[in-house]
C-alpha cells in the first residue's frame, strides 16, 4: 500500500500552531510609556506635544509619570531659604497646579486609552510641598498634590517619593542618587530591575548574580524639561531630553529609551518620526 504524501498537511498544521503561539504571545505582551522629570512649567513644550502624538498612536497599556512632573516653583526651598524674594515674584501654588492640569495632565488623560494603567510617582520636587507645609501648617489640606490634582479620583495609582511601582519584572522609582555611577548604585541597593529618573540623563548598568545567573538592570532615563532653566545659569551639564518606550510580559521585558536632541523631535522605536 502506498501512503499518501502528508507533507503539505503537516506544514499547514505546524503553521497553525505557530500562528496560535504568536497570537498568544501578542495577547500576553503589553506596551508602556514612561515620562520623567517634566518640571512643569519648565517642561520642553515641543517634546511634550510630539509625545502626546505618540501616546495616541501607541495606545499604551501602562503609563508612568515618573516624578518631578511639577517643579513646585512656589515652594522652592532653595530660593526661599536663601531669601531670594525677587525670584519668587508671581509664583503661586494654585496657579501651578491649574496650569499643569491644563497643559499636561488633561491632554495626557485624553490621549491615553481606556483601561490604561496610570502610575504617578512623586519626585523630590513634589516632596517639597510637604516640606513647605511643615514650615507653614496653615497650608495643610490646601497645598497637597492629591488635594489639587485629585489623582486617585481620576484613576491614577499614586506613590510617594521613595516608594516604587511594579510593572512586570520592572520597578519604577523616581531616583535618588546623583553620583557618577548612579545606575550601578541603584542596582546594588535594590537588587532588582529598576527604571528611574532624577538625573536627567540616560545611564545603564547590569549585574549578573551568581544565583541562577539572574540579571538585574538599572536604567536612568532622559528628562522632559528645558535644558537651561534659570537656576542652571548656563552651567554645563549632561542632561538629555527624552522618555521611555517599553514592552513587557510577566517574565520578560525590553526597554527602549528615546532621546530628543533637536527641538523636541524624535524617532520612535517603530521608525516613525515625530
Sequence positions of predicted segments:
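A short acidic (Asp/Glu
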Residues: 44-45, 73-77, 129-134, 183-184, ...
Amino acid at each position: 500500500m502506498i501512503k499518501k504524501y502528508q507533507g503539505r498537511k503537516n506544514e499547514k498544521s505546524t503553521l497553525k500552531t505557530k500562528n496560535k503561539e504568536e497570537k498568544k504571545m501578542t495577547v500576553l505582551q503589553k506596551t508602556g510609556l514612561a515620562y520623567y522629570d517634566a518640571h512643569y512649567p519648565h517642561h520642553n513644550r515641543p517634546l511634550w506635544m510630539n509625545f502626546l502624538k505618540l501616546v495616541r498612536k501607541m495606545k499604551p497599556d501602562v503609563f508612568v509619570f515618573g516624578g518631578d512632573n511639577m517643579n513646585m516653583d512656589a515652594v522652592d526651598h532653595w530660593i526661599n531659604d536663601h531669601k531670594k524674594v525677587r525670584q519668587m515674584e508671581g509664583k503661586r501654588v494654585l496657579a501651578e497646579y491649574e496650569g499643569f492640569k491644563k497643559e499636561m495632565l488633561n491632554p495626557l488623560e485624553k490621549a491615553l486609552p481606556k483601561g490604561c494603567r496610570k502610575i504617578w510617582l512623586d519626585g523630590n520636587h513634589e516632596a517639597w510641598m510637604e516640606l513647605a507645609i511643615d514650615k507653614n501648617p496653615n497650608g495643610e489640606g490646601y497645598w497637597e498634590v492629591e488635594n489639587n490634582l485629585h489623582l486617585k479620583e481620576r484613576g491614577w495609582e499614586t506613590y510617594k517619593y521613595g516608594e516604587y511601582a511594579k510593572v512586570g519584572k520592572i520597578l519604577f522609582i523616581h531616583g535618588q542618587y546623583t553620583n557618577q555611577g548612579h545606575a550601578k548604585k541603584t542596582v546594588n541597593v535594590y537588587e532588582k530591575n529598576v527604571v528611574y529618573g532624577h538625573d536627567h540623563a540616560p545611564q545603564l548598568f547590569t549585574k549578573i548574580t551568581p544565583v541562577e545567573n539572574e540579571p538585574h538592570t538599572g536604567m536612568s532615563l532622559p528628562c522632559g524639561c528645558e535644558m537651561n532653566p534659570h537656576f542652571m545659569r548656563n552651567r554645563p551639564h549632561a542632561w538629555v531630553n527624552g522618555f521611555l518606550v517599553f514592552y513587557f510580559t510577566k517574565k520578560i521585558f525590553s526597554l527602549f529609551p528615546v532621546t530628543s536632541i533637536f527641538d523636541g523631535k524624535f524617532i520612535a522605536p517603530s521608525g516613525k518620526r515625530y
